């Protein structure tokens, strides 16, 4: 993740939560920034390369997988209300549990 924020805002929300050792520390931070009344802004004009998991490796071994699942559960519990309300920037037709923008196909009633 690449984040830019004023130091005063970073300090106000107590920075990144180290209990999210690998996953969700950036997302948790952005939700806390928004909850504090600030706006998160995305720019398509910045360009950078991020090689996901390049330095730490993938979450394939049992210990890393367990840590990841724990962080998912903790994030979902902490932000249950906000997650239930939905992401205002996310297309409601996409499956929120997948990273590939798959459609969330619901059976017809």
Show which residues each predicted segment covers:
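Conserved active-site-proximal loop/helix segments of enzymes involved in bacterial cell-wall
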Residues: 51-54
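A short, conserved alpha-helix in the catalytic core of glycosyltransferases
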Residues: 1-14, 19-49
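C-terminal, non-catalytic tails of nucleotide-sugar-dependent glycosyltransferases
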Residues: 4, 40, 57-109
């Amino acid at each position: 993740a690449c984040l830019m924020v004023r130091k005063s805002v970073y300090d106000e929300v107590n920075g990144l939560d180290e209990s999210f050792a690998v996953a969700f520390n950036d997302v948790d931070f952005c939700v806390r920034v928004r909850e504090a009344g600030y706006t998160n802004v995305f720019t398509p004009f910045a360009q950078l390369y991020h090689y996901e998991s390049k330095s730490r490796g993938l979450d394939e071994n049992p210990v890393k997988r367990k840590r990841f699942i724990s962080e998912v559960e903790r994030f979902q519990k902490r932000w249950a209300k906000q997650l239930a309300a939905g992401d205002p920037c996310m297309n409601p037709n996409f499956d929120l549990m997948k990273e590939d923008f798959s459609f969330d196909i619901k059976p017809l009633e």
